[in-house]
A protein has these predicted regions:
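NAD(P)H-binding glycine-rich loop region in Rossmannoid oxidoreductase-like domains
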Residues: 34-93, 99
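Mid/C-terminal beta-alpha module of Rossmann-like enzyme folds, strongest
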Residues: 199-253
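Glycine-rich "substrate-gating" loop/helix at the edge of Rossmann-like oxidoreductase active sites
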Residues: 125, 154-163, 183-194
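N-terminal Rossmann NAD(P)H-binding glycine-rich loop of SDR-like oxidoreductase domains
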Residues: 3-23
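Alpha-helical substrate-binding/gating segment
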Residues: 170-180, 185-216
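C-terminal amphipathic/interface module of NAD(P)-dependent oxidoreductases
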Residues: 252-287
Length: 287
């Protein structure tokens, strides 16, 4: 199949594109061209700026694909600039579990219905969750829902994570730096970059539509992360109101996501314990 990947040269886009290539698809990467990818002659490349509709039009107008995988849908205008000018049979949007407005265990896909919200055409708002909700809603202005997939992941972890969020805990605990944490005991879900990327690639060849959750089995708290680092580096975490805000502190109560729909495709998610602590070991070594 002819597949356009918008974004995808870093983090979990790497295993995603690798899997698409391995499965024999004809892959075109559309990026701003700011980062060198590692795919060589296995892919074609288009340069565009998703936030500039004229750039998107110049790069994609008149082009058609079997599938578009949109990894940079942060607002309704992001989606409009793309789907207004590129044609596809199937649209897979990298959404987020941030679209859900309640926190509890086993959150299901139907707890956020993009059709239920008012569409507003906005550039990328400061409110990340709002932008993601509107991005889902905007897609339905251009595509039938049966031809759309909205992939909802929690925080993605992995060796290629460039955000520095997991490193924050190792750096602060091992370095004796204070952290500000309010919700230390609340547990939540994560997913590893390899499974995140390979799951999206798998969706290309399925008939699934609508929203789909994807996350590792098991949930962990900041206390779990901190306790492991404390034991490994032999230092106690300094928790202080004047400390730096911890990146995973936005979870107020235990929450997880029901992945029955994803698992019905035969995709198996690993347990978070199979990779979290090795990632923490790596972060500790780098301090």
């Amino acid at each position: 199949m002819k597949i356009l990947v918008v974004g995808g040269t870093r983090f979990f886009g790497i295993p995603m594109v690798k899997k698409l290539i391995a499965d024999g698809h004809e892959v075109t990467l559309a990026t701003r061209g700011q980062h060198t990818d590692r795919f060589g002659s296995s892919v074609q490349r288009i340069t565009l700026d998703k936030t500039d509709e004229s750039s998107v039009k110049a790069a994609l107008c008149g082009k058609s694909f079997d599938v578009i995988i949109d990894k940079v849908a942060y607002s309704s205008n992001d989606v409009r600039s793309l789907l207004k000018h590129a044609l596809c049979e199937k649209y897979i949007q990298m959404s987020s579990c941030a679209v859900y407005q309640s926190e509890h265990l086993n959150i299901t896909e139907n707890e956020f219905d993009q059709k239920s919200i008012e569409l507003k055409w906005l550039d990328r708002p400061a409110d990340y969750a709002l932008g993601k909700r509107l991005a889902e809603r905007a897609a339905l202005e251009f595509m039938d829902e049966k031809n759309c997939v909205f992939v909802r992941f929690p925080v993605v972890l992995g060796e290629n994570d460039y955000t520095g969020r997991l490193a924050f805990y190792a750096q602060h605990i091992c370095g004796g730096l204070p952290m500000h944490i309010q919700n230390i005991n609340a547990k939540t879900s994560y997913i590893h970059e390899t499974q995140a990327g390979e799951f999206i690639a798998k969706l290309v060849d399925t008939d699934i539509s609508g929203a789909v959750n994807g996350c590792s089995d098991g949930i962990v708290s900041q206390r779990d992360i901190i306790g492991y680092i404390e034991k490994k580096c032999g230092k106690q975490a300094i928790i202080s109101q004047s400390g730096d805000n911890a990146p995973y502190d936005d979870v107020c109560s235990d929450k997880s996501y029901d992945c029955t729909k994803a698992k019905s495709l035969g995709f198996a998610f690993s347990d978070i314990s199979s990779y979290l602590y090795s990632l923490l070991d790596n972060e500790i070594k780098q301090v």
